[in-house]
Structure formats: structure tokens, C-alpha cells
Amino acid sequence: MKRAVVVFSGGQDSTTCLVQALQQYDEVHCVTFDYGQRHRAEIDVARELALKLGARAHKVLDVTLLNELAVSSLTRDSIPVPDYEPEADGIPNTFVPGRNILFLTLAAIYAYQVKAEAVITGVCETDFSGYPDCRDEFVKALNHAVSLGMAKDIRFETPLMWIDKAETWALADYYGKLDLVRNETLTCYNGIKGDGCSHCAACNLRANGLNHYLADKPTVMAAMKQKTGLR
């Protein structure tokens, strides 16, 4: 039996990954992390979606220690979430240092326990937002270290790594879940479900990608299929 663990936040990217994983694996587990995030509604959204989509199990892990160590606008009410700035350089204050290091490592430990061969994460380098822990080289390096440390080949899969946000919408549509991803996920840094606040970087990236996809579905769908190998 093929098993996978999806690092699941209930946002657009991880939900699209879950939708695909459910088609590719016999048994899919979801792991969501409570790290004291500013908008805890995402945990409830993740629970609802994991149940609705048919995950074998959904585990919420308490990693609130991260909140004590990692200062970010996503973990501190006193730090405002910035509006989207297209020309902004550097690492944004929405970056949570060490988050993906911790999440992927703990997801791999869980995968070991449930005998899953893969850990799936929705990180993406094409729409790079200044987060160093979303880079392909980081994921591969950590995957190598974790496999060595566990003496087990647990594969880190990044199905969205080389597709852009428009193509991510196309991937959701390919599996017949575009409306669900649009209306029932929570991607917004200000904690607003669906289309979100329209001001933060996450909402702008999501909206621009959707508009691009809806404006030229055949071209974007074809590009997504070419990059992912889907037919």
C-alpha cells in the first residue's frame, strides 16, 4: 500500500497537494501544526478540509515552542502584516524562521510511524516570496539529512515547486476542485477565508494567479501539464 503524509495548513497550496495526493496514494495522512500562529482559524479550516476530502487521518501537532523562538508578523499581534509591495526586496516579516525545517522533520517522524514513503509539501520556488526555506535546494538538503538520520528513505515531494500560481490553480481545476480551493481554503495572512483581504502578499499572489488562469485556461493548463507530466 502506498502511503503519504501531507504537510497541511488548509491554504491553497497544501489543499491542492492533498487533492493530488489522494489520487496518487492509497492512504493519505495530514499533519497540521499549531505553532501559536496569529490566525488560528487555519487549523479549523484544515480539520474541515481533511475530513471533507477524505484523508485517512489528520494530526494536529502542538509546536507552540516555535512561537517563543520565531518572531514574525504571523506569530506576533504587535507586528503588522504588510500590504503587498511588488518591488519589495529581502526577507518579509511574514517569514517564520525555522518553520519548514521543523514542519518537514516532524512530518517525516510521523511518516516513519505510519509507514508512509513520502512527505508532501506545497512549497514553491517559482513564485518565490523571499522565504529561504521554500527553495528546492533547502528541501533536498533536509530530505537527505532526515533520511540519513532515520536510516529510512522517506521522500520529500514538492509537486508545486516549479509551477507558478496560475498553474497551481490549473492543477486544482485538473482534479475538479477549483471552486473548493477558491472558496474553502485560507491563504490570507489576515486570516480571511476564500478570496481573503486582497491587500496582503498572499492574497495578491493568489488573486493574480487566478485571474491569469481564468483569462487563458487552455494555455495555462497546457503549461501545467507539461511541467508536471500530467496528461
UniProtKB/Swiss-Prot annotation:
Biological processes per GO annotation: queuosine biosynthetic process
Keywords: ATP-binding, Ligase, Metal-binding, Nucleotide-binding, Queuosine biosynthesis, Zinc
Catalytic activity: 7-carboxy-7-deazaguanine + NH4(+) + ATP = 7-cyano-7-deazaguanine + ADP + phosphate + H2O + H(+)
Ribosomal protein recorded as keyword: no
Cofactor binding, per record: Binds 1 zinc ion per subunit.
UniProt protein name: 7-cyano-7-deazaguanine synthase
Similarity annotation: Belongs to the QueC family.
Gene that encodes the chain: queC
Binding site for ATP: F8, S9, G10, G11, Q12, D13, S14, T15, T16, C17, L18
Catalytic activity, EC: 6.3.4.20
GO MF assignments: ATP binding; ligase activity, forming carbon-nitrogen bonds; zinc ion binding
Function: Catalyzes the ATP-dependent conversion of 7-carboxy-7-deazaguanine (CDG) to 7-cyano-7-deazaguanine (preQ(0)).
PANTHER family reported in the protein's UniProt record: 7-CYANO-7-DEAZAGUANINE SYNTHASE (PTHR42914:SF1)
Domain of life assignment: Bacteria
Signal peptide: none
Cofactor list: Zn(2+)
Binding locations of Zn(2+): C188, C197, C200, C203
